[in-house]
């Protein structure tokens, strides 16, 4: 008998600062509605130098890992394109910071915004073979395009942590999925750069083309059509992107279903609209947003489109489980977002420039205002100094 496998728990973390997108638009000489409606972003997470992918992942994972679960994690798959080391995996730093058992495999997975999906699917296959195993999958990134660039409005950052197990509380993953890879230069970041190179308009078109391709292939493999779905969840580098994706397939649905799919999309973009781009975590923040704000019932089939520039796309699906609300702490996320402090454009620019320098100097970061459990205190002897409070 095939074991049902999927997402048992989800945790999310984003730092305690944000920038208002209407204010950024005004500072950049743009109509605020371009950012609020045209791009579809209201707030953007501002990442202080005291947070990086490891600390954000630890802050997300600590929400879902009890001491007993920490002893049971068999593998950590850390999806990111914001790596802090060309050799050592961020998953190893994370496993140590969380106090996981040394009997754990810990590796990093990279393919732009697709990394966490690769982690999720590899984790699911592993658990199908080892049904007792629990795998921690992370999607954590800092989305940086640069001050005064076209991509600036699509920045952000944060981490999603998912526990993949047999008989999961939130979502069982269907076995069939459709994936597609092509060598495309729409977005990339050579090792000498701290900001990505991107052709945003081209990337938007590749995203939509890949979605068309994998959606058609998925339907052919499964004989399912749009009527078999209650909601679609998209990778959201900015919320308008997913809206364009949904528009591409809506004509396949009858008017009533179009209405419910649109309502589900509105729920799925709400939290992303207030956090910004998490790169590889974005699809899973959108899932969390749908679970928090949507009107879904157990048994609903959800479709997921994952896209990582460069480029790789995947369409997969899963079934919502009866106790899905027990798999995440919605109230904690509401509090996390509500308690963030708004920074001005000038403050954001200072924080943006204050990121840990790309050299070997010893640095002590100003940790006085840091409220997160895990944070970065600086660098000594070329080693990042992680702390817990
Ligand atoms: N009110 C409402 N909408 C407005 C507006 C206004 N006053 N002014 C402009 N808009 C709309 C435009 O019509 C456009 O909508 P559309 O895409 O539906 O046609 C949208 O706002 C964006 O305007 P545009 O002129 O295309 O913006 P831009 O040249 O500044 O670029 C991106 C936008 C998204 C391409 C750019 O931010 C970017 O490159 N981001 C990075 C993308 C990325 O991360 N890609 C890789 C991962 S998939």
Placement of each model-derived feature along the sequence:
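A conserved active-site cap/scaffold subdomain adjacent to cofactor or substrate pockets
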Residues: 201-222, 227-246, 250, 271-276
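Conserved catalytic cysteine-centered active-site region
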Residues: 34-38, 42-54, 82-134, 251-282
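Flexible, glycine-rich active-site loops centered on histidine and acidic residues
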Residues: 128-161
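Short, well-ordered amphipathic alpha-helical segments that serve as non-catalytic structural scaffolds
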Residues: 31, 53-68, 90, 206-222, ...
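Condensing-enzyme catalytic core mediating Claisen C-C bond formation in acyl metabolism
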Residues: 1-50, 149-205, 209, 316-389
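Conserved beta-ketoacyl condensing-enzyme motif
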Residues: 7, 53-113, 223-249
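Catalytic phosphate/nucleotide-handling subdomain of diverse soluble enzymes
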Residues: 288-337
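Acidic, glycine-rich active-site loops and adjacent beta-strand->loop/helix elements
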Residues: 11-13, 79-84, 111-116, 139-144, ...
């Amino acid at each position: 008998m095939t074991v049902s496998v999927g997402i048992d728990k989800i945790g999310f973390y984003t730092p305690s600062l944000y920038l208002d997108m209407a204010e950024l638009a005004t500072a950049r000489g743009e109509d605020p509605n371009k950012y609020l409606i045209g791009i579809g972003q209201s707030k953007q997470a501002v990442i202080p130098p005291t947070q990086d992918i490891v600390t954000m992942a630890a802050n997300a994972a600590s929400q879902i890992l009890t001491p007993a679960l920490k002893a049971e994690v068999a593998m950590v798959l850390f999806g990111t394109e914001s790596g802090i080391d060309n050799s050592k995996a961020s998953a190893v730093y994370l496993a140590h910071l969380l106090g996981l058992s040394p009997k754990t495999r810990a590796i990093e997975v990279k393919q732009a915004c697709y990394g966490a999906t690769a982690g999720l699917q590899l984790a699911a296959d592993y658990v199908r073979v080892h049904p007792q195993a629990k795998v921690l999958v992370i999607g954590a990134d800092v989305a940086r395009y640069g001050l005064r660039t076209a991509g600036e409005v699509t920045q952000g950052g944060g981490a999603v942590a998912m526990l993949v197990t047999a008989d999961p509380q939130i979502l069982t993953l269907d076995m069939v999925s459709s994936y597609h890879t092509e060598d495309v230069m729409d977005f990339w970041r050579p090792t000498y750069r701290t900001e990505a190179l991107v052709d945003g308009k081209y990337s938007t078109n590749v995203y939509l083309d890949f979605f068309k391709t994998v959606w058609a292939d998925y339907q052919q493999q499964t004989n399912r059509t749009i009527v078999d779905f209650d909601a679609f969840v998209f990778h959201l580098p900015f919320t308008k992107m997913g809206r364009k994706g949904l528009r591409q397939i809506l004509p396949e649905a009858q008017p009533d279903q179009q209405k419910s799919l649109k309502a589900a999309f509105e729920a799925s973009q709400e939290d992303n609209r207030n956090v910004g781009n998490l790169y590889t975590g974005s699809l899973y923040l959108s899932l969390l947003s749908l679970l928090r704000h949507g009107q879904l019932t157990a048994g609903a089939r959800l479709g997921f489109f994952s896209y990582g520039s460069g480029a790789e796309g995947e369409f997969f699906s899963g079934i919502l489980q009866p106790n899905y609300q027990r798999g995440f702490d919605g109230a904690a996320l509401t509090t996390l977002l509500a308690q963030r402090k708004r920074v001005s454009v000038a403050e954001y620019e200072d924080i943006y420039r204050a990121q840990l320098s790309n050299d070997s100097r010893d640095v002590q970061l100003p940790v006085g205002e840091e409220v997160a459990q895990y944070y970065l205190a600086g660098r000594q002897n070329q080693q990042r100094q992680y702390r817990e409070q």
